[in-house]
């Protein structure tokens, strides 16, 4: 028996791994921040911890090069300002794509990054 396909609020399919297509990029071969493609890329959920699954379903994730933009000192896990900038950008895009107000975003993701 086949599993029923799940879809997010935009009608985009959610894969078996829990991810919908990113709404931030359609280029999964290059780092979202630096544009390089010659390095290992990680899938980074913009809003982690309690909001990780929502980020996956809503398409709020980006590919990042592992050593520099994801885990490095200047990356989102080593640089709080870089992480805030990415969260702000993702919030703006989510509000535009889903038609959410700032309050609706806050209700879904716990706070506003604007």
Regions found by a protein language model. Name each.
Residues 43:
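Short hydrophobic beta-strand that contains or immediately precedes a catalytic carboxylate
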Residues 1-40, 85-114:
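A boundary/linker detector
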Residues 47-61:
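Short linker/helix segments within small regulatory modules
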Residues 6, 48-49, 74, 81:
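Alpha-helical and His/Cys-centered functional microenvironments
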Residues 28-29, 60-62:
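Short, surface-exposed beta-edge/turn micro-motifs
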Residues 16-19, 50, 79:
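Residue-level detector of alpha-helix boundaries and kinks
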Residues 35, 50, 66:
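Pocket-edge structural micro-motifs
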Residues 38, 61-87:
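Short Cys/His-centered divalent metal-binding micro-motifs
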């Amino acid at each position: 028996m086949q599993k029923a396909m799940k879809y997010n609020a935009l009608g985009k399919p959610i894969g078996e791994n829990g991810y919908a297509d990113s709404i931030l990029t359609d280029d999964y071969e290059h780092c979202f921040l630096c544009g390089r493609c010659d390095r290992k890329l990680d899938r980074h959920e913009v809003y982690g911890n309690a909001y990780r699954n929502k980020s996956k379903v809503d398409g709020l994730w980006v590919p990042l090069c592992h050593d520099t933009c994801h885990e490095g000192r200047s990356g989102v896990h080593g640089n709080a300002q870089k992480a805030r900038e990415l969260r702000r950008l993702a919030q703006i895009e989510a509000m535009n794509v889903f038609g959410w107000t700032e309050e609706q975003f806050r209700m879904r993701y716990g706070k506003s990054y604007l």
